[in-house]
Amino acid sequence: AQASKGYIDPLVGRVEEVERVCQVLARRRKNNPLLVGEAGVGKTAIAEGLAKMIVEEKVTDILRNSVVYALDLGDLLAGTKYRGDFEKRFKGVLAELREKEGAILFIDEIHTIIGAGAASGGVMDASNLLKPLLTSGKIRCIGSTTFQEYRGIFEKDRALSRRFQKIDVSEPTVEETVGILKGLKSRFEEHHKLKFTQAALKAAAELSARHINDRFLPDKAIDIIDEAGAYQQLQPPSKRKKVVGVGDVEAIVAKMARIPPKSVSASDKEQLKGL
């Protein structure tokens, strides 16, 4: 529904990953892809991008009539007072999905279903209710989780992890990130009512890779572009710029990384020359 209304941003690049997801979904059994990657590399974006591709009919015939549903565990758990309430709701959701032809269930942060809804000491949690359906291939499920959670929580549940096909989602390179930013450029320009230069997009990708080390591309580069636009929105109309350039991006990176603005774009060669 969100994809058909145009709420989802376009997916740029990630051809191999999307191809592999489609390949796993087309299997007869154990047709459940699991996207594993660091926070911010775009795992959810791949699932959303697949939904958008299905709506735009850019997928193969086998997936053409599919519909991607996102599971909100919080909504399922909210207000379950007594034992069995959660299981009843979850069973209802699964039964509904089984009847719908071409339904694909997307569970973001899939490690949360292990232990979800289990009463103290009880073994019946969401993952155990899901297991029988996953093996038979009656429900196709896309999951996403980080390496840390995959190793620490998900992989320990052998019966569940073997029903999924692990797909590693690596961090894109700076060049790929520039391509992603170019693809999203029009969305941010429309929201902030200004323009971004190509040099500003390149600077956002390069400087975020160099100076913001606790997060991953393309997420941190997208944040910089978004924040550069937001900064201009906060300025009085007389000072507001219509075009965001490299200087504005450097100023935002300096603020986010807490470094002096001068040293943001200084190259390593220049620094080494003065040693």
Task: List PLM regions with ranges.
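AAA+ P-loop NTPase nucleotide-binding core of proteostasis motors
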Residues: 1-275
